[in-house]
Amino acid sequence: RDVERSRGLGDVYKRQNINWAEALESIGAQVVYGVVGLKTHAKMLLVTRREGRQLRRYGHLSTGNYNVRTAKLYTDLSYLTADEETTADMDGVFNHLASQNRPPKLRKLMLAPFHLHRRMIEKIERVGLAASRGEDARIVAKMNALTDEGLMRALILAGQRGARIDLIVRGACMLAPQVPGVTD
């Protein structure tokens, strides 16, 4: 019964999303729906605007949906930027989704399934190395779930090297905190 209820809510949200997409398209916005066979799970908004003789981009990245009802249930992070490298990456992601061409080379963003996993592990390892040199090193990460063995191994090693690690995991988390000799 709960599955039916949640499926029903999902259908309502899908219909609302379609309505919003159609309304945005009717006023000239380009709405990108994603790639068939690839789950698109991004909360990104990119505005490109002409300012004088130049085009300027403004981007919004979020861990949460743009939904008033669910916003009351979750704690999400939001990032608003006009940084040229970040907004260029966002533009590349949208172009990839719209054209289904090869994934773009990104400078600041990471895109699954193409390079997110590898680059996350590299970044965690870099923080661990900094901690082992006595530098102030910290990882703060928010995610829906933490079940990947490679990421967990990298986090454990970084913590053992002295990095301070704060994880905000909404769902399944297979990494137990404060295990003596492992994650203490």
Regions found by a protein language model. Give the residues of each.
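A generic structural motif
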Residues: 6-7, 31-38, 165-175
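Single conserved hydrophobic/aromatic residue that forms the stacking wall/gate
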Residues: 2-13
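Phosphate/diphosphate-binding loops
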Residues: 11-77
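Catalytic-core regions built around general acid/base machinery
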Residues: 1, 19-27, 150-161
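Long hydrophobic segments that form regular secondary structure
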Residues: 77-175
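Generic long, charged, amphipathic alpha-helical segments
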Residues: 178-181
